[in-house]
Amino acid sequence: PQVKIHPAQQHSLEWLQARAGVVTASEFDNIMTPDFEARTGEMRQSYMCQKLAERWTGGSLPGFQSIDMEIGQILENEAIPSFEIEHNVKIQRVGLVLTDDGRFGASPDGLIEQRAGIEIKCGRPDTHVRYLLGRSVPDEHLLQVQGGMFATGLKEWVFMSYCRRMPPLIVRVDRDDEI
């Protein structure tokens, strides 16, 4: 499928405007359950009202950002070169990738040589250890990873959990077209 790539830096005003009214991979949990069933009720309705309001006004409000999230964004700048060197690949940073119709999108942390996307989480050390012990994409990020593949049309995604002074968790995920 055809996609549109917006080069705007993630979290910038231009990026927020490009996301206005778009159902994005990072928010798929508002419309689907972890078992990949359609959500019903207040959560879905609230999210869909937000997206409609964004379409009508042409703007998207910045979301809440904790200190841990800010630190995570900084650490992504360490994680990407680390992954590139370790795997001998080049990662293209992108702001937003939209489906051709503009209804769905994803903001991957990068595209690996146009064949896979990458989602990097740089959380707290205790969270990273939990991810390492699980050795798979944590349930709370699975919809985002599958949503990224849906929005970009890619068939492969890499989930990486990165924490300084610890081994990274790297999980390759294939697209599940049954979702």
Segments predicted by a language model, with ranges:
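Active-site region of the double-stranded beta-helix
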Residues: F83
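Nucleic-acid nuclease catalytic cores
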Residues: M69, H87-P108, I112-I179
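Charged, glycine-rich intrinsically disordered N-terminal tails and low-complexity linkers that flank
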Residues: P1-I74
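Residue-level preference for nonpolar/small residues embedded in alpha-helices
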Residues: L75-E76, E140
